[in-house]
Design a protein with these regions (language model features):
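Active-site-proximal mixed secondary-structure blocks
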Residues: 173
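PRPP-associated nucleotide enzymes
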Residues: 2, 8-168, 176-259
């Protein structure tokens, strides 16, 4: 019975209980009405939906013809630069903070936002985490190294050798930008990147046949987490017939670059 319970719990199939334990009203009632609320997978599904809706409403998730930093012609674009209001940047920070807690808990690190779009993400995430009791420093890089005043390549917190850093980015396509970030990280000897968080995992090939995020993980030795992935976006879009063309274009693109 215990094995069946665990099996059905993770498959989200409660029919087993409604038949075998139909005479136990309290047990059936708890599984029918309480279980979906308390199991994390249900909460996460609604959380992903809310995030995708947020990306669309804020103009961050766009469909059309775009060119990624890697040079690829892409049918959808994630542009954190469209986060233009205090309300939206605060909300974005809350989503990243939720992902941070979900994946690495209350680990003490420094947040790094690559210029330019990662800067506001790092600030917003730091604020959101602080509201939940985790006060993390943040910093970002200059595009041009400053040779006067405080100088250096970084603005904000100055990480020291041995400290752990978490990178917060908007998206990884082929991994071009994150590799540039890792070159910048080398300017501080002994710094350790603990993880990287992005809005969307596009599930695309990197330099080879593997997914870009998998390549990054293998190349640099840290995990890359996303709030949602392209499969979540496709599933969300397929619920509305008006999105049929966008879905087809994404799927066609993935026939070439999907990992």
């Amino acid at each position: 019975m215990q094995a069946n319970f665990i099996n059905c719990l993770f498959k989200r199939d409660r029919s087993y209980y409604r038949t075998k334990y139909a005479d136990d009203f309290a047990f059936t009632l708890s599984l029918t009405f309480i279980l979906p609320v308390n199991i994390g997978v249900y909460k996460m599904e609604s959380y992903k939906r809310e995030f995708i809706q947020f990306l669309q409403n804020a103009g961050v998730l766009k469909f059309g013809d775009f060119t990624a930093k890697s040079g690829r012609k892409i049918p959808y674009f994630i542009n954190a630069g469209e986060i233009k209001t205090g309300e939206n940047i605060a909300k974005l920070g809350e989503f990243y903070a939720k992902a941070y807690f979900d994946k690495i808990g209350k680990k003490q690190t420094a947040l790094y936002g690559p210029a330019y779009k990662g800067i506001s993400i790092a600030v917003a995430t730091s604020v959101a985490l602080a509201k939940e009791g985790l006060n993390l420093p943040f910093f970002f890089n200059r595009k041009e190294v400053k040779d006067h005043g405080e100088g250096g390549v970084f603005v904000g917190y100055k990480p020291q050798a041995g400290e752990e850093v978490v990178i917060v980015e908007d998206v990884i396509t082929a991994g071009t930008a994150i590799r540039e970030t890792m070159e910048i990280m080398k300017s501080v000897e002994g710094i350790k990147v603990a993880a990287c968080f992005v809005m969307v995992d596009r599930k695309e090939k990197g330099k080879g046949e593997k997914g870009a995020m998998v390549e990054i993980e293998e190349e640099f030795g840290f995990p890359v987490y996303s709030v949602v992935d392209v499969y979540d976006i496709i599933e969300y879009l397929e619920e509305d017939e008006a999105n049929k063309e966008n879905v087809e274009r994404i799927k066609k693109y993935r026939e070439v670059y999907g990992a």
